[in-house]
């Protein structure tokens, strides 16, 4: 069972020159610094899933010399990472390439012996990444099982002894009783050679991957027949799956897409294999397929949307000593983030730098960050990117900043009001492909004094401090002598159009005018929570026409996060989180912005866009938002849950928790029992029930943990889905890793019902 050959044949790549070169392997120069370049051997393994890298480190385990292609975010040709930009300028770009990983491990910067070798690696890896992504769940499952078989086949004779079979089951994360394993082994060993080969391994594979819960559901739908007719499939789609579009057209399109048997397809029928393929596909996912594209109205003012926003975007770790990196900006943009933070200070050689002021975090050039933003701003979404500037620079270096922004961003930069948009904020659609600046500004929407205006003006203490998040920095600003006050360069000020940073002076009372529509304030999480507690409805109304930015409290020097949900419930749009810090807060954040095609903008519910709204999440009364639902989740089973610690021999003991995040009365959590020693196909079949009063603000988080009686449970995987995007019926939930990346085959099988 050669999974690599299977993979190549499946995608017609068996004669591909690039992949042949990678399977053969070759020497590459690994680059770490100006003085550290070492030759190392790299080779694509036969499973076409992993790369082996030579290591000279003492005590290195064989597993640690492998990395999975599934962990690769991107392969870049040329000097396109900080490492190669700094340390390989002497080598032609066409020999240099970098492997950038999804998680927070270091980028692998490499130099090939020739341009042709570099091309083989870049194109070859690109093909595997592309084709792996296009495999359906059944193909992924088969490919994964084959690679586990290869690992277990210690003597490489393509046969499976009973001892190797036990190793194989451990690889699969399943503890099977020896007598049961021996029983299956004997059933499959037709040749009675005390080893399994070829068809015998296939038979074993089929017994292992049989899913009784799917068999049961299929039998119910067919009335115990071998296949589903179009009418039976329509009935299943209507009554179980609650599909609004259920009808013969949808049923036939599912048969066409997922039925592997040409005979069944010709007879307009679906077999059990086709049924499983459908349930494992995007059509059978718990997340509404229609919400994977932009489907909301994108023509409303910016203040009517939640905006995916990052705090201290330049950091990869904590705020005191962590590294700053342009890579952090690229990661945030690739995750759909639309508001980035740039903490700007004077740097050497008249070049502004970005870092966390008065700390030991490393420094990066402002121009390098702007270049990275230019290159990646619109890869994940076409909608506007807001650059939140925290400006500590001298006049001279502010002018350098303005010059870099203008020359590097060119027409992407919004540097004047849009025609006719002078009384309210423009919409995401009007700002498509544009980069906006948020920062201090002299005067109103139009530059003061035209051409002959002042060259620079002193900014008020309050407006300058309004932009400074760090309390130490803010108090320094407020105690500066007159000569040291921040003077703002007109060139930079004129680039701030619709996002002028101002000090928040309170909600206007009747008859007093508040902020201009293009003025916005920033609030620490504590101040925002206080405003929500004391004036929740006023905050909601303020946020109908004005943008509000929320940032983490100053004490969070470890870059921990706060819950964004309460801020969203108050209508706050730019709720900035530390994207570099995984955890439940980022899980919920990613879940919220998975909606609307993951474009980084999600339309707020109507009651958070109404200037006369009476909504207050802290004092919930009846209103248009009050549409109570009963949510019933039956957690049936799990599939291919990953090992928590790959170096441990232990098998996971999984349990599932389902959480509701929303207004405080809706917040709830229920859990299943623990299944011991089975991460491969655990079975719970447990019903969990919830009452949800404000479904438009609710998110459902499914968390799988490895139970540990003596310490904190280990995280295995999770998925967070807005309740409005959660599909009913029998569904698979595709689990994400701690860093928010998709586990290739890990799923939960559930049945969801939602009733008024």
Curated annotation (Swiss-Prot):
It is an enzyme of class 3 (hydrolase). GO terms for molecular function: calcium ion binding; phosphatidylinositol-4,5-bisphosphate binding; phosphatidylinositol-4,5-bisphosphate phospholipase C activity. Ca(2+) 3 binds at residues 312, 341, 343, 390. Residues 296-440 form the PI-PLC X-box domain. The modification Phosphothreonine is found at residue 457. Ca(2+) 1 binds at residues 153, 155, 157, 159, 164. Residues 492-609 form the PI-PLC Y-box domain. Residues 21-130 form the PH domain. Signal peptide: none annotated. The keyword Secreted does not apply. Binds 5 Ca(2+) ions per subunit. Two of the Ca(2+) ions are bound to the C2 domain. The active site is at 311, 356. Ca(2+) 4 binds at residues 651, 653, 677. The modification Phosphoserine is found at residue 460. Residues 609-737 form the C2 domain. Its cofactor is Ca(2+). Gene3D superfamilies: C2 domain (2.60.40.150), EF-hand (1.10.238.10), Phosphatidylinositol (PI) phosphodiesterase (3.20.20.190), Pleckstrin-homology domain (PH domain)/Phosphotyrosine-binding domain (PTB) (2.30.29.30). The production of the second messenger molecules diacylglycerol (DAG) and inositol 1,4,5-trisphosphate (IP3) is mediated by activated phosphatidylinositol-specific phospholipase C enzymes. Essential for trophoblast and placental development. Binds phosphatidylinositol 4,5-bisphosphate. This is 1-phosphatidylinositol 4,5-bisphosphate phosphodiesterase delta-1. The gene is PLCD1.
């Amino acid at each position: 069972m050669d999974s690599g050959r299977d993979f190549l044949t499946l995608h017609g790549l068996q004669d591909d020159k690039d992949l042949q070169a990678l399977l053969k392997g070759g020497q590459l120069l690994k680059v770490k610094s100006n003085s550290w370049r070492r030759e190392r051997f790299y080779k694509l393994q036969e499973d076409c899933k992993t790369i082996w890298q030579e290591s000279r480190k003492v005590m290195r385990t064989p597993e640690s010399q492998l990395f999975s292609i599934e962990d690769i975010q991107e392969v870049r040709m040329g000097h396109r990472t900080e490492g190669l930009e700094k340390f390989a300028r002497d080598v032609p770009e066409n020999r240099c390439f970098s492997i950038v990983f999804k998680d927070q491990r270091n980028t692998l910067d490499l130099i090939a012996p020739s341009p042709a070798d570099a091309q083989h690696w870049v194109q070859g890896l690109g093909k595997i990444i592309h084709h792996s992504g296009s495999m359906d769940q059944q193909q992924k499952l088969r490919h994964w099982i084959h690679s586990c078989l290869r690992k277990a086949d210690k003597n490489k004779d393509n046969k499976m002894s009973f001892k190797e079979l036990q190793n194989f089951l451990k690889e699969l994360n399943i503890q099977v009783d020896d007598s049961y394993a021996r029983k299956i082994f004997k059933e499959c060993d037709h040749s009675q050679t005390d080893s399994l080969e070829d068809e015998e391994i296939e038979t074993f594979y089929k017994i292992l991957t049989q899913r009784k819960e799917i068999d049961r559901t299929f039998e119910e739908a067919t009335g115990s027949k071998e296949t589903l007719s179009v009418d039976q499939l329509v009935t299943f789609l209507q009554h179980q799956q609650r599909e609004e579009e259920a009808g013969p057209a949808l049923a036939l399109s599912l048969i066409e897409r997922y039925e592997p048997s040409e005979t069944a397809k010709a007879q307009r029928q679906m077999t059990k294999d086709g049924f499983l393929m459908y349930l494992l596909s995007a059509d059978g996912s718990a997340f509404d397929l229609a919400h994977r594209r932009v489907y909301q109205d994108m023509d409303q003012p910016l203040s009517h949307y939640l905006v995916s926003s990052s705090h201290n975007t330049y950091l990869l770790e904590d705020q005191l000593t962590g590294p700053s990196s342009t890579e952090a900006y690229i990661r945030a943009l690739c995750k759909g983030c639309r508001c980035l933070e740039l903490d700007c200070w004077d740097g050497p050689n008249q070049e502004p730098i970005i870092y966390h002021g008065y700390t030991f975090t490393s420094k990066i050039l402002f121009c390098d960050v702007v270049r990275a933003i230019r290159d990646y701003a619109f890869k994940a979404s076409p909608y506007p990117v807001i650059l939140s500037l925290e400006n500590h620079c001298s006049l001279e270096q502010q002018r350098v900043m303005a010059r870099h922004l203008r020359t590097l961003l060119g027409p992407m930069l919004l540097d004047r009001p849009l025609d006719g948009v002078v009384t309210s904020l423009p919409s995401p659609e009007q700002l498509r492909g544009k980069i906006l600046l948020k920062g201090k500004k002299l005067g109103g929407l139009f530059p003061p004094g035209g051409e002959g205006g002042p060259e620079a003006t002193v900014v008020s203490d309050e407006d300058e401090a309004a932009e400074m998040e760090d309390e130490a920095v803010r108090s320094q600003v407020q105690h500066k002598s007159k000569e040291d006050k921040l003077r703002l360069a007109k060139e930079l000020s004129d680039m701030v159009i619709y996002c002028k940073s101002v000090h928040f002076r309170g909600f206007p009372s009747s008859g007093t005018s508040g902020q201009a529509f293009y003025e916005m304030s920033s609030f620490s999480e504590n101040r925002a929570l206080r405003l929500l507690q004391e004036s929740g409805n006023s905050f909601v109304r303020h946020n109908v026409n004005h943008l509000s930015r929320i940032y983490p409290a100053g004490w969070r020097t470890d870059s921990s996060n706060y819950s964004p949900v309460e801020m969203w419930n108050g209508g706050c749009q730019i709720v900035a989180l530390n994207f570099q810090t995984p955890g439940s807060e980022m899980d919920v954040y990613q879940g919220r912005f998975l909606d609307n095609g993951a474009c980084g903008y999600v339309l707020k519910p109507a009651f958070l866009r109404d200037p006369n709204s009476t909504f207050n999440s802290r004092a919930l009364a009846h209103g248009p938002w009050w549409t109570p639902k009963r949510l019933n989740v039956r957690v049936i089973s799990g599939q291919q849950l990953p090992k928590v610690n790959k170096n441990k021999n232990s098998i996971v003991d999984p349990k599932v928790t389902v959480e509701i995040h929303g207004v405080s009365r809706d917040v709830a959590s229920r859990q299943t029992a623990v299944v011991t020693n089975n991460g491969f196909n655990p079975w719970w079949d447990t019903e969990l029930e919830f009452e949800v009063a404000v479904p438009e603000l609710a998110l459902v988080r499914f968390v799988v943990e490895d139970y540990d009686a003596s310490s904190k449970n280990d995280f295995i995987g999770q998925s967070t889905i807005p309740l409005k995007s959660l599909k009913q019926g029998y569904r698979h939930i595709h689990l994400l890793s701690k860093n928010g990346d998709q586990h290739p085959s890990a799923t939960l099988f559930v049945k969801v019902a939602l009733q008024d």
